[in-house]
């Protein structure tokens, strides 16, 4: 039986009708070897048995059907490449040399923060039973007004912001990736800010003074994500680039709550559109965004998977059509890993 995806998940199908490009990627480096058989058992127990979406087959129109006979040998592999097949559920784990786990999940199934929730579920020492919950908190009038204000502000930024030119809608496949691993404490932001500022100010990227940098903000805690079945629960809050102002400090000091919620509701609105209109609007929004800056704190302490210590975690987000760059910081065990992807 077919079901329609939630609007916030369907948006990512509109942005990638091929269901092959918008893949969130993650790598776990283990201190001790594990076997692919044990990894399959763990994925079955912790993920497939708890989250229905890991059995979903998603169509390019944004509908889901359940894979009745999920073949784990196709989704948890050993020494192969991550290849997302639209005819199967859109995820894969690949064990390389028994000590590195590569993970690929399509954005329609889960966003980056949900991927963190998946990692936390896989590394639980005593897995608990997941009970579906819904928040009963009623929004205040001030929150409603800030949200309405944020919707109009986000719409103005996306549709009418002056001096911001749309980039080429064609998605370039020729991009280079560079990774840094910095042993910085979580309280030290210097290197992250320096790299971010240098990247945004790089004249080769042709980022204008009025360009928009999109900062993903989670609107749901990890616990709520797990209890409510994962999925996309974040907003892209637009942040203008201004000279001689720290992008990071500006974002942290500005009152962004209404704008964040406004951007979230716009994404839900686009996800509710008919397919042809939703695809058009998603391309327009993504083409307006020149880059994505995100940061995820996974754990301050070391986690274990199947008894093996996780030494390092890397993660990166896909580049949407029209974007110039993407940079992701992963905070794990007191260190920061920066992954940067730039279009050539």
Question: Where are the model-predicted features located?
Answer:
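Generic start-of-chain signal for non-secretory N-termini
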Residues: 1-21
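Soluble acyl-CoA-dependent acyltransferase catalytic core bearing the H(X)4D motif
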Residues: 2-5, 27-41, 47, 54-322, ...
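Glycine-rich, often proline-containing surface loops adjacent to acidic residues and nearby aromatics
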Residues: 23, 98-100, 333-339
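Extended, hydrophobic beta-loop-alpha segments that form or line the acyl/peptidyl-thioester binding
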Residues: 322-344
């Amino acid at each position: 039986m077919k079901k329609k995806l939630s609007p916030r998940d369907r948006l990512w199908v509109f942005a990638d009708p091929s269901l092959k490009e918008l893949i969130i990627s993650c790598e776990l480096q283990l201190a001790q070897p594990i076997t692919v058989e044990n990894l399959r058992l763990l994925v079955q127990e912790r993920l497939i048995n708890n989250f229905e979406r890991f059995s979903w087959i998603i169509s390019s129109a944004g509908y889901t059907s359940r894979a009745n006979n999920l073949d784990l040998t196709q989704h948890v592999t050993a020494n192969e490449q991550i290849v997302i097949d639209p005819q199967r559920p859109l995820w894969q784990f690949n064990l390389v040399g028994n000590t590195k786990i590569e993970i690929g999940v399509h954005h329609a199934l889960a966003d980056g923060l949900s991927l963190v929730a998946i990692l936390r579920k896989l590394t639980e020492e005593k897995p608990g039973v997941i009970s579906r919950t819904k928040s009963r908190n009623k929004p205040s009038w001030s929150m409603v007004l800030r949200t309405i204000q944020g919707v109009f502000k986000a719409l103005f930024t996306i549709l009418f912001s002056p001096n911001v030119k749309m980039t080429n809608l064609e998605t370039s496949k020729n991009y280079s990736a560079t990774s840094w691993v910095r042993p910085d404490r979580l309280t030290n932001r210097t290197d992250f800010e320096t790299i971010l500022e240098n990247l945004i100010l790089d004249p080769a990227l042709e980022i204008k003074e009025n360009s928009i940098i999109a900062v993903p903000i989670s609107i749901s805690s990890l616990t709520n994500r797990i209890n409510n079945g994962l999925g996309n629960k974040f907003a892209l809050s637009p942040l203008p680039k201004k000279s001689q102002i720290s992008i990071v400090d500006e974002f942290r000091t500005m009152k962004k709550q209404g704008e964040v919620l406004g951007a979230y509701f716009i994404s839900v609105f686009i996800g509710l559109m008919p397919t042809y209109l939703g695809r058009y609007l998603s391309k327009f929004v993504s083409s307006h965004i020149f880059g994505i800056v995100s940061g995820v704190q996974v754990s301050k302490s070391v986690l274990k998977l199947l008894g093996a210590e996780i030494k390092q975690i890397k993660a990166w987000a896909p580049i949407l059509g029209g974007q110039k760059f993407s940079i992701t910081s992963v905070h794990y065990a007191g260190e920061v890993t920066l992954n940067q992807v730039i279009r050539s």
